[in-house]
Structures are given as C-alpha cells and as structure tokens.
Amino acid sequence: MSRPRRRGRDINGVLLLDKPQGMSSNDALQKVKRIYNANRAGHTGALDPLATGMLPICLGEATKFSQYLLDSDKRYRVIARLGQRTDTSDADGQIVEERPVTFSAEQLAAALDTFRGDIEQIPSMYSALKYQGKKLYEYARQGIEVPREARPITVYELLFIRHEGNELELEIHCSKGTYIRTIIDDLGEKLGCGAHVIYLRRLAVSKYPVERIVTLEHLRELVEQAEQQDIPAAELLDPLLMPMDSPASDYPVVNLPLTSSVYFKNGNPVRTSGAPLEGLVRVTEGENGKFIGMGEIDDEGRVAPRRLVVEYPA
C-alpha cells in the first residue's frame, strides 16, 4: 500500500508572528500556514483577539515540540480602563458595573504589590480551560457559571508604567497559565472601582529575540517580492524561521555519536557520556549537532527517546 501524499511543504521551524489586533490566534495560524504552504502548523498558546504581539507559530516537525513553549514564561504590556468592569474582563465584553475611581497612589502601590511573586488565580469564565470536557467560554456564552479551582502562578515582575485619568498601564512578566485579564479584574476589585483590559500586547515568550518578530504584512510583501524576482517564495520566507528545537531551548543538549543515534532514532534508550543525571534533554547527533528529538534520562542513566524528528523523503 503506497504512502498517502502529503499536502504542502515539509518545512520545519518556528515563526515569531506579530499577531494583529482583532484576529484570532487560529486565524493567524492558518494565514501563516498558507503563506508558507506548510503541511502542518500549530501555535504555542493563544492570544485573545484583542491582544497583539508575539505568537510563535510552529511549522512541520516543530509542532512536536510546541508543548515546551506552553511551559515558558511570558511578558506583557497592558492598559486597563478603571471604573468599569466587563463580563469578559476586556473591552470586547459588555459593561456590567461602573464605579468611581477614588483610590490614592499609596493604595494603588499596595494593591499592585499583592500581585507580585507566587499567587493563586481563579481563571476567567471566558477562557479556553475545560470543565467536564467543555470549554469555559462555551458555558459563559450560555450564561452558565461553573466552579473553577484557583491555580498557582508566579508574577516575576510587575512594573508600574503610568496612571493617567482612568487609565492604568503596567508591564507584567509572568509564568505559564497566567491570565492578564484576570489580574486586571482582580486588581480593579482590590481598588474598589473595577477595571478591564483595553490594550494588551505580548512582548516576549521565553528567550526568543524580540527583533525576530514579523508581521503578516511583511510576509505578504516577501511573497510579492519573490514573484517579481521570479524566485521561489521559500528563499525569502524560510530564513525568517527559528530552529525547530528552539521551543525547547531551556533544556540541556546531549550529543550522540552516529553509532548511538541510530539506536535512539529507532526508539531505544542509549548510554552516553556527559548526560545530566535526570530530566529532559535536547538530543543532537554527529559533529554537526543535528537535532533529532527530545529525550529523558531514565532510571538507569540512559537517554530514552520521548519525541523524535521524522525525516520525510523528498
């Protein structure tokens, strides 16, 4: 039986997309996938339609390693409208309460300090978390509120930028699973006036360089430029991609000699010198250090395969 024909290119890497405002993360993903003519694509944690900023798009084999970015920390710039609370905690929702803004600078500083460090957060009903197999926002749209457990998060840094009139601007560096909308809603309640997000931009994800972020408009311009020069668009698009193992850049590297990597790629744990005592590792092979997958140190100190790169014949 012949192997089914694959649709699109076998292109592997990560594009750091600057998601535009008003577009869902999935719509942005599909546009990038079409521009690159990629056979597979996936993002690494959705941004709300209102939000802009860094959305890493994994193409091809890089989709296998996107899960490691979900665990990474992120940095945001947010502007809150004080005195109004909405049902979604952002400007896309309906105003449900209005109150005067009467807090002092000292009260604001004290309230902000309660959100720094290790805290617990109850996720918004307007989130993609699931309850009994159904997303929370699906319940919310039906007017149903379901129980949610508080989840531990870490706010590594919360910077006060400005407070002018009924606007408050902050910069937040936080752990995975943090809902900025919920921080703003909770802050508004602490201040006694209510608040919601009117602007949100993701500035950074993990250690990705911010100067490598690109817009959809720039991608389209490169496609047009390639057509004018009568060259494949891939020649201009592909250099924009980060390496496919970049989602796992926080993990140590173990390099296997080619004699051992053959066994590893066939699903077998292997012994090698220089491996850590435990945990996940990025596995490369040979003198050129080609990435071949993720491994984990097993109980016998061997490198056991966890996620492998598949090389498709041309």
Curated annotation (Swiss-Prot):
The gene is truB. Responsible for synthesis of pseudouridine from uracil-55 in the psi GC loop of transfer RNAs. It holds the Pfam family TruB_N. This is tRNA pseudouridine synthase B. Belongs to the pseudouridine synthase TruB family. Type 1 subfamily. InterPro entries: PsdUridine_synth_cat_dom_sf, PsdUridine_synth_N, PUA-like_sf, PUA_sf, tRNA_psdUridine_synth_TruB, tRNA_sdUridine_synth_fam1_C, TruB_C. Its EC number is 5.4.99.25. It comes from the Bacteria. The keyword tRNA processing applies. One of its GO terms (biological process) is tRNA pseudouridine synthesis.
